[in-house]
């Protein structure tokens, strides 16, 4: 069993809800698996043609950020997150203890 029941809600009562990007099911906002992806607006095949056609030496390709939100079942199905053993669940990826310590000071 997970320590936080798969949620990031502490002392908030109720969290808002979001819709899954894949299936459309309603999921609590703190339970949803969120990923932020930066994607180029121009695909790589046409980027070379654009680079030859432009007169500028340095051409910055426009990019856009996409925030994806998935329910737990869709995130497991799409292999965004995986089922982990009870010991492996204790490992927190992307967790920086120094950042938390500086926020409390």
UniProtKB/Swiss-Prot annotation:
GO CC annotation terms, alphabetical: cytosolic small ribosomal subunit
Name one molecular function that GO assigns to this entry: mRNA binding
Q: Does the keyword Cytoplasm apply?
A: yes
Q: Which UniProt keywords apply?
A: Cytoplasm, Ribonucleoprotein, Ribosomal protein
Q: Its GO biological process terms?
A: translation
Question: Where does the UniProt annotation locate this protein?
Answer: Cytoplasm
Superkingdom assignment: Eukaryota
Keyword Ribonucleoprotein attributed? yes
Instruction: Report quaternary structure and partners.
Output: Component of the small ribosomal subunit.
Indicate the family of this protein. Answer: Belongs to the eukaryotic ribosomal protein eS26 family.
Q: What is this protein called?
A: Small ribosomal subunit protein eS26
Tell me which species this is from: Encephalitozoon cuniculi (strain GB-M1) (Microsporidian parasite)
Q: Which gene encodes it?
A: RPS26
């Amino acid at each position: 069993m997970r320590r936080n029941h798969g949620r990031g809600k502490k002392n908030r009562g109720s969290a808002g809800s979001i819709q899954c990007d894949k299936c459309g099911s309603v999921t609590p906002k703190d339970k949803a698996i969120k990923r932020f992806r930066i994607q180029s607006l121009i695909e790589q095949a046409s980027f070379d043609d654009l680079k030859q056609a432009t007169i500028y030496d340095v051409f910055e390709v426009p990019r856009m950020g996409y925030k994806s939100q998935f329910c737990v079942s869709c995130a497991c199905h799409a292999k965004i997150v995986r089922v982990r053993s009870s010991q492996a669940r204790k490992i927190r990826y992307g967790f920086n203890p120094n950042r938390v310590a500086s926020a409390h000071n």
